[in-house]
Amino acid sequence: MSPTDTTPLLYSWDDQSRHQDPDWHKLRNYHGAWYRRISRRRFSQFIFAFGLMTLFVLVYSISSNLHTPTQFTGHKVRGRRGAVASEVPVCSDIGVSMLADGGNAVDAAIASTFCIGVVNFFSSGIGGGGFMLIKHPNETAQSLTFREIAPGNVSKHMFDKNPMLAQVGPLSIAIPGELAGLYEAWKSHGLLDWSKLLEPNVKLAREGFPVTRAMERVLKLPEMAHLLKDPIWQPILMPNGKVLRAGDKMFRPAYAKTLEIIANKGIEPFYRGELTNSMVKFIQDNGGIVTVEDFGNYSTVFADALHTSYRGHDVYTCTLPTSGPALIEGLNILDGYPLNTPSLAFPKRLHLEVEAMKWLSAGRTQFGDPDFLPLDHLDVVSKLLSKEFASQIRNNISLSKTYPWEHYNPSYDLPISHGTTHVSTVDSNNLAVSITSTVNLLFGSQLMDPVTGVVFNDQMDDFSIPGASNAFNLSPSPWNFIEPFKRPQSSSAPTILTDINGDFEMALGASGGSRIVTAVLDSIIKRIDMDYDIESMVASARPHHQLLPDILILESGFSKSVATRMKKYGHKVWRLKQHDTPLSQIQAVTRHHSEYYGMSDPRKYGQAAAY
């Protein structure tokens, strides 16, 4: 469709002309296979009868279902010795307490991540996995992968007949990596005793903690009703027959005992000991295929981080299977445009940003676990990260119009990812950490071992499932098919920036599934090109485009006139309403002169802390 076509490109709820647009029907069909369980719940395989507006909004609210106004309000914090940003205020405080007790940014990040797994355990915990980026001053940044791995007894066709089994239940569980990752980071970089990092979290789980507003929102979701009736979950989520509300105390005694064992004995009991036996027995009793050997064979991966330069700033991010390479591709594309000059003033600047999002989304279809990619394909991925390739891409970008999705040449279809939480930390020595962790969908597999209190992930859902092409005639990505001990692709993009002098500038990352990498890209543009302070960078409205579906989503902070102007470039625009679920949630820390600032995204009710 060209910009001169008369078909409306900006729709509202009452605009019935959208039903005449074939792309809207493609959108519905495209997501049908993956959203049988909307917002981390069981969902009928044939639920296309839902109204398109309802389906579309639900599709883009999978990671959190947290409804907040887009006129987001929050406040940055400031300190002289470091800062921590997380989605839970008490977890940011725990991180800062580690700094105050002589710990460093790695200690703070570990303690805060443990805390989120206690408090907001619908999105994170030691039953999940993730990625960490660590940057010491004057040293090469390190990427730590502790993504979950598929069990040994899997096959790539195991979910062909029923993809729902990859989203909920025992077969959806991959081998957790979070605990191994946190322990490896501590061994390599931590200063405090291991037990010190767990002590406040054991206390929270045992003595109780206030239910967050985010947790209250989750528990009110209709799809959570079955968990509230489950005899394992009910004592935690609905004690005394009443669903807990924000501010009420929640207790997790079994999880407290598990964390206490880990504090005293390290990770051995979890991967090769008493905790392993309990977890494996529970999973197998429920029909799972995870074995004790699977846990014992788990290992993390340390590697040099990926790097690019943007306007003279060094940008570091995590390696495959994250979406860090896609972030680098997007930044390399935009680095060739003077976005802060009058010639590329708004909305042309926004148009170019969206074009970069579409190209990086096409690039993501080439990604997978690097340990399972052939060498010649790794060369293909490396090409995507080069400045030369970005220059070629710019030759295929128009300053006056967008193109149909085929122009961007995606190779394969990818599953839509979900969930996550993020923590960013920095200390007085300018050691910075950016860590993203997840159990995937809400409460992961929705299975919790009553003995250990561990909530297991459903990360098998992040693999691609062989089968028919999607509504856009793209086949599932073979690079992301299930194989024993393989890690699925991830949308995570932990990121650290240094300034033109090589000094720490910012650590950031996001939660929000497939919207993570576009949120990080947008934040970097606002920080470097538009000179936003950290508060404005995090709280301002964000755009999102992931190429397929071919829809530009704008948070409601963008005016309707902006959406209309983007329409003139040929973009199909969906402008969210004020109380629609936000696209993503950023956690960021920065340094300015001798002071440190932290900002937690108010979209998820977070609060940073500084010291």
Curated annotation (Swiss-Prot):
Record's note on what induces expression: Induced upon nitrogen starvation and oxidative stress.
Gene3D superfamilies per record: 1.10.246.130, 3.60.20.40
Lumenal side: 64-611
Keywords assigned by UniProt, alphabetized: Acyltransferase, Glycoprotein, Hydrolase, Membrane, Protease, Signal-anchor, Transferase, Transmembrane, Transmembrane helix, Vacuole
Principal location: membrane
Transmembrane segments: 43-63
Catalytic residues in the record: T420
Keyword Lipid biosynthesis found: no
InterPro entries named in the record: GGT_lsub_C, GGT_peptidase, GGT_ssub, Ntn_hydrolases_N
Subcellular localization, as worded in the UniProt entry: Vacuole membrane
GO cellular component, one term: plasma membrane
Residues with attached carbohydrate: N138, N153, N297, N396
Topology in the lipid bilayer: Single-pass type II membrane protein
Listed GO biological process terms: cellular detoxification; glutathione catabolic process; proteolysis
Subunit composition and interactions: Heterodimer composed of the light and heavy chains. The active site is located in the light chain.
Protein's job: Catalyzes the transfer of the gamma-glutamyl moiety of glutathione (GSH) and other gamma-glutamyl compounds to amino acids and peptides. Major GSH-degrading enzyme, catalyzing the hydrolytic release of L-glutamate from GSH. Plays a role in the turnover of the vacuolar GSH, serving as an alternative nitrogen source during nitrogen starvation.
Family note: Belongs to the gamma-glutamyltransferase family.
Record protein name field: Glutathione hydrolase proenzyme 2
Species this protein is from: Schizosaccharomyces pombe (strain 972 / ATCC 24843) (Fission yeast)
